[in-house]
Every structure is written in structure tokens, then in C-alpha cells.
Amino acid sequence: MRRRDLLDLLLLAAVWGGSFLFMRIAVPEFGPGPLMELRVGLAALTLLPLAILRGKVPLIARRWKAILVVGALNSAIPFLLYAYAAQSLGAGFMSVANAVTPVWGAVIGWLWLKDRLPLIRTIGLSISVLGIVVLVWDKLDFGTGGDGPAVLAAISAPLFYGIAANWTKRFLSDLDALSSATGSMIGASLILAPLAISTWPATPVSWQAWSATIALAILCTGFAYIMFFRLIASVGPTGAVSVTFLVPVFGVLWGVLFLDEIVTTQIMAGAAVILVGTALTLGLVRWPLSSGSKPRSV
């Protein structure tokens, strides 16, 4: 990996890690629906000029049905779940929970598209699930004022990312990333609009919340997508997906620096176990095999 690619990877991880920080700042004033509508709407406006310049709009229009599904699964639903969780959970916790996204992608691919899931990746999946258990062990309180619903929202959001990735692979594999991203943001904006309108804040929103929202939409969504596309073109999908391992680092760091969050031993242990499992699931780490042995598939 070239130095420029490494810098891009670090910058992208820092930006995506910051999305959890900005959600924590903005969601108390906007609420989940309006905040996520602004996120996808402003992101769409950021990407749309580039799509127009590259002549992608006719292609988006022809494939609008499949792209709309991506908008729901990859943006509207998971973004809304994270925004709901951000009302009570820390940025660091959510960024660690997000690290299981590639794991769900592998599982859904195995169940739906019959992709091979070698034994080593099955072990990685099991380890990641164990990491989630460690992470949420003492937070599943469903009593009044408990964090249980928020925790379920945070750990469910990556599942929809995994479904979206496989939907894209199944129905939109021939569509370029810019068209898919732009179209899905427009679709997500249309999906979230009714909820946003019906729950729009009745009181004025502070400039701090507006600033966090604009950063979340333009920097952490629109700009981040463009950076991610560039990384894929430069280092390939496997290299680009390694950003998964860096996002929790920055998510935790920003939470500590700007929100005075406390990094508990439980969060660190959960993060370590999840990241080891994710690395195995992605095939980025080779399990020591005896000479001449071959990994089995399930």
C-alpha cells in the first residue's frame, strides 16, 4: 500500500469514526428521523453533481427499484437505528458494534447467495458473536430507562449493511459505486422524509447541532463515500475494507476527547474480540494449518 493510500485509509477511518460523535451531538435536538433525513439528503446533494458530471443520472433512473432497496437497507434503516441508539449509548460503543458489519455480510452471503464459508471464517464469525456478547453483557436492561432497546438497535444496524451488500452483489453488481451511492442516498431521503416531517423539532435547533449535522452529512457520508471509492480503485476491495478495523479506534478516541466518554475494560475487550473475529471472517488472517491440510467449508 502506497503512503497516499495509507493516509487516505487513516483519514477515512477518522471521518467515519467521527460520524458517531456527530450523531451524539445532534440527535438530542433533532431526533433520529429528522437528523438522518438531513444526513442522507445533504449527502445526496453532495454526490449528485459528481454523478451528473459523469453522466450517471440516466443509469440511476433505469435501475431505480433495486437502488431504492439499497437506500432502505444500506442507509435509511441502519442510520435510523444508530441515531436511535445514539440517544443513550456512547460513540465508542457504537463504533465498536459497527465493526461486525463484514461478518454479517459473510453470513448473509452464505445463507442467501450460497457463498462458501470456509471453516476459518466460521470460527471468525463465532469469535465475533462472542465479542458482541462481551460488549453488551451488562447493558441489556429493558426496564424503564434501560439501555436494552438502544443496544439492540446498535447491534442490529450492521445486519442491514450485510443484507445490503449482498443485495447489491445479487442485483447491482454491474452498477458502478458512484451511481449506487448517489441513487441510494436519494432513495433513503425519500423513504425517511415522512418520518422527518412528522417529527421535526418544534423548538429552534442550536448552531452546534446544525454544525454536527452538516459535518455528518457532507463529511462523514458524501465525502467519505468518494474517498472509499478512490480507495477501492487504488488498493482493491480487500484493502479498502480494512478501514473496518480503524473506525472503532477513532470512534472511541473522538468520544473520549470531545464527549468525555470513559473507555471501560469491557469495551476494550469486546472490541479486541470482535476485531479478531472480523479479521478471520474476512480472511485477512491465516489460521495455522498443519502441513498439507486444507480448510473445510460449511
Which role does the model predict for each range below?
Residues 1-6, 29-33, 37, 59-65, ...:
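Juxtamembrane helix-entry segments on the extracytoplasmic side of multipass membrane proteins
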Residues 47, 68, 108, 117-139, ...:
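Hydrophobic transmembrane alpha-helices of multi-pass small-molecule transport proteins
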Residues 47, 105-107, 111, 142-199, ...:
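Transmembrane alpha-helical segments that form core, pore/gating elements
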Residues 46-59, 82, 101-126, 249-269:
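C-terminal transmembrane-helix exit sites in multi-pass transporters
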Residues 15, 19-23, 48-98, 134, ...:
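Specific transmembrane alpha-helical segments of multi-pass solute transporters/efflux pumps
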